[in-house]
Amino acid sequence: MVSNPMDTMTYLSLKSTGLNPKKVIGMGGALDSSRFKTYLSLALNKPQKGLDAMVIGGHGDTTMIPMHRFAKYNDEPISKLLSNDKISEVVKSTMVGGATLTKLLGTSAWYAPGSSIAYLVDSILNDKKKIIPCSVLLDGEYNHSVPCIIGKNGVDEIIELDLNELELVEFNKSVDAVRSMNSTLSSHT
């Protein structure tokens, strides 16, 4: 799923079609993670190739959670490479990146979402088993971006992160916001 509000559209598509939940995937986490990597790369003044970073949560500037605690460059935690202030700046830039681009373009982005979808499709078609944050059904009642192993069957596995207390609070706030949107739009379908 690409259309916004992406998490809710993925959820509604799943509920209205009755398709296997492992095959209904939203690309928001992949897109948001690519933006996070871009901003980290710029802050580090290093190529993206060595970066391992992801965004979980909803695909929205108030619901996404850039997971800076897990981010690494060539296996070195970014917390050892960037100051806390710089990391906070990268996180903020990531969270407003889509809105900033839309404002500059006067329309929604198309290249980065297309690239994110191509990345997902490549992992599915070639059974690459890549770990990609995707919006998938969780607990049978909402969709949210979490790291998933993506292969020929769609979502092969959902990877559970060991979130600290603050990250868990942020994730639960994000879940509540997506649930609210699901409820609002579900009542109109």
Show the residue positions of the predicted features.
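Long, compositionally biased stretches enriched for glycine and/or charged residues
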Residues: 41-189
